[in-house]
């Protein structure tokens, strides 16, 4: 299997590359190396791994491959609220460029376009769970650019016949995640003997999925040759930010006195909750939050 990965030096992308190489698949990794990228990885000199430093909105050629999987994206909500230009360039124009490059290939050489999206495209809801059939109602510039990219992908399938997959992942956590995210920030604060900052009262609910479980779902979808469909990927662990911080603290024999409450964030959605039933039925996928957390922080 030949896989072209964009954003393979990032958090989720790097775990995907690692698993693909373990399977003996060949990887070409295109990444522009942002502040959150992994600059050095154990497989840099692997015989089946090729790295190309490039911006997906600017590349003009695609190597031949079976699947093009797009992890490349700006993803920090706070940054998108302060300045959305780079989000539009990477998350919309970058996807458009990749689709155009695929469209320019002869039909026999067109790869599956596997687009990694987010559960944030749905917006928030106070109860129940979103399914893949629900309307998209993004509520901040980041999620709006991801929703726009999805519309581009669907339009290129309908107009030009380009095969696609779209996954909408919930909050991922795990090794190599940049410290701006909640769980690595908790770990950093514990290491430095600082208090963990929790925005607002910590009651905002997120769905937490271990990154390796997420990657396993992506691999299953590829191996089962599923295409032209959309899947949520979520462990369905609906926990508040405060609960997650307390859970991490327990692993280090710390108590909630190590938490401090700070000003709320702009553009904060109250609750994200999506159903993964469609994915589970299609692939047999079965994640586990607590065991994932043990693997990560234990």
Annotate each PLM feature.
Residues 1-172, 212:
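N-terminal Rossmann-like NAD(P)+-binding domain of SDR-like oxidoreductases, especially those catalyzing
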Residues 11, 36, 75, 177, ...:
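Short alpha-helical
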Residues 14, 190-298:
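C-terminal substrate-binding subdomain of Rossmann-fold SDR/epimerase-dehydratase oxidoreductases
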Residues 15, 63, 79-82, 177-181, ...:
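Generic recognition of short, well-ordered alpha-helical segments
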Residues 37, 72-75, 79, 84, ...:
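A general structural signal marking secondary-structure boundaries and capping sites
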Residues 98, 153, 186, 279-280:
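Structural element of the ATP-grasp superfamily
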Residues 128, 179-187, 248:
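A glycine/serine/threonine-rich, flexible loop-to-helix segment
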């Amino acid at each position: 299997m030949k896989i072209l990965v964009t954003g393979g030096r990032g958090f989720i992308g790097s775990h995907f590359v690692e698993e693909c190489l373990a399977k003996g698949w060949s990887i070409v990794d295109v990444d522009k190396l942002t502040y959150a990228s992994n600059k050095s990885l154990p497989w840099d000199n692997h015989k089946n791994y090729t790295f190309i430093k490039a911006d997906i909105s600017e590349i003009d050629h695609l190597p031949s491959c079976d699947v093009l999987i797009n992890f490349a994206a700006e993803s920090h909500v706070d940054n998108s609220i302060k300045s959305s230009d780079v989000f539009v360039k990477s998350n919309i124009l970058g996807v458009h460029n990749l689709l155009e490059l695929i469209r320019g290939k002869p039909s026999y050489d067109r790869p599956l376009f596997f687009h990694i999206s987010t559960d944030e495209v749905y917006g928030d809801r106070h109860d129940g769970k979103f399914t893949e059939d629900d309307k998209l109602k993004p509520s901040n510039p980041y999620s709006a650019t991801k929703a726009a990219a999805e519309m581009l992908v669907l339009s290129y399938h309908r107009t030009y016949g380009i095969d696609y997959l779209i996954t909408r992942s919930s909050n991922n956590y795990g090794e190599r995640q940049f410290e701006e995210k909640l769980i690595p920030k908790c770990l950093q604060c514990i290491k430095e003997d600082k208090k963990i900052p929790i925005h607002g009262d910590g009651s905002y609910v997120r769905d937490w999925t271990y990154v390796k479980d997420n990657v396993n779902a992506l691999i299953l979808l590829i191996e089962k040759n599923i295409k032209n469909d959309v899947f949520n990927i979520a462990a369905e662990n609906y926990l508040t930010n405060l609960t997650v911080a307390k859970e991490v603290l327990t692993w280090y024999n710390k108590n909630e006195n190590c938490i401090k409450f700070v000003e709320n964030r702009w553009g904060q959605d109250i609750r994200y909750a999506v159903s993964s039933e469609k994915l589970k039925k299609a692939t047999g996928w079965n994640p586990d939050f607590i065991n994932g957390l043990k693997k990560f922080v234990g």
